[in-house]
Amino acid sequence: MSLTRLLIRDFRNIETADLALSPGFNFLVGANGSGKTSVLEAIYTLGHGRAFRSLQIGRVIRHEQEAFVLHGRLQGEERETAIGLTKDKQGDSKVRIDGTDGHKVAELAHLMPMQLITPEGFTLLNGGPKYRRAFLDWACFHNEPGFFTAWSNLKRLLKQRNAALRQVTRYEQLRPWDKELIPLAEQISTWRAEYSAGIAADMADTCKQFLPEFSLTFSFQRGWEKETEYAEVLERNFERDRLLTYTAHGPHKADLRIRADGAPVEDTLSRGQLKLLMCALRLAQGEFLTRESGRRCLYLIDDFASELDDERRGLLASRLKATQSQVFVSAISAEHVIDMSDENSKMFTVEKGKITD
């Protein structure tokens, strides 16, 4: 599915824009601060309900306006889908799909699987386990119909359990929460483990292309001891959890550990190499989704030329073209992306929030 039309109103520094898009490569060229990243962020927000540069809604809505409005048209193989998102300064959202209100942001996310590559995206590799859990959970969300409900219930139960830990004195008082929590934790961990095992070879092969000088390994850690039942872990660690007032073990502590030549990648790779690894992982994940489900990602790439030499830029471009996916690329100069352009691509110029093609 590709985004054929994008309407933006009062988002960041963009007052209004109406863009007809290519199903292939779309280039956004402009100086720093021109608004090219804001276009990428508008697309991301339309599919996620939140921006990727700021969680504060007031910074995303254009100055002195009350709300932003985003609309898009998605073209699938058999039908077109109209989608829309409005969000005001209070954080209240309205999601519209095919002319009807009352939809959830998760429905937009399901319609628009995306891979985001930004200069800030190093957090996937050096920002702690929660970013790698998000990497795994993105895939589980798009591959397992029951994942989102299970994940939402898990978060709710963990919050309730942590609150209860401040009040209880005996483990038996926690059993009502743990009775619900344990099967959810085990199911989510199973989904994550199955996905990690399934994509491991793809990640290794793609990383080998981008970083042939390193031997990269990937290891899923579920968040509690291997070969131990989660029920046993919760009961055994009750006193420790009660002192900490939070649940110290579980799927909320899971990680995907990535090592280069046996050492953590954040301690081994340069910034340029970390960006290559990030690109490789995002690409592998998108390709895996297509192979498993037939669905294609949208790829959003901010500041394409940053920290990549000509050879690696060419490699990334050729791999992206091979996916036959829709790609949005921002760059300071058209020279950085001209060799990626073909007869089906579109080049947009962005200047002070105004977008022309």
UniProtKB/Swiss-Prot annotation:
Alphabetized SUPFAM superfamilies for the sequence: P-loop containing nucleoside triphosphate hydrolases (SSF52540)
Positions that bind ATP: G30, A31, N32, G33, S34, G35, K36, T37
Protein family according to the UniProt entry: Belongs to the RecF family.
UniProt keyword DNA damage present: yes
Name under which the protein is recorded: DNA replication and repair protein RecF
Keywords per UniProt: ATP-binding, Cytoplasm, DNA damage, DNA repair, DNA replication, DNA-binding, Nucleotide-binding, SOS response
The keyword DNA-binding is annotated on this UniProt entry: yes
Family matches, as NCBIfam families: recf
Main function: The RecF protein is involved in DNA metabolism; it is required for DNA replication and normal SOS inducibility. RecF binds preferentially to single-stranded, linear DNA. It also seems to bind ATP.
Superkingdom of source: Bacteria
GO biological process, one term: double-strand break repair
InterPro entries, per the entry: DNA-binding_RecF, DNA-binding_RecF_CS, P-loop_NTPase, RecF/RecN/SMC_N, RecF_2
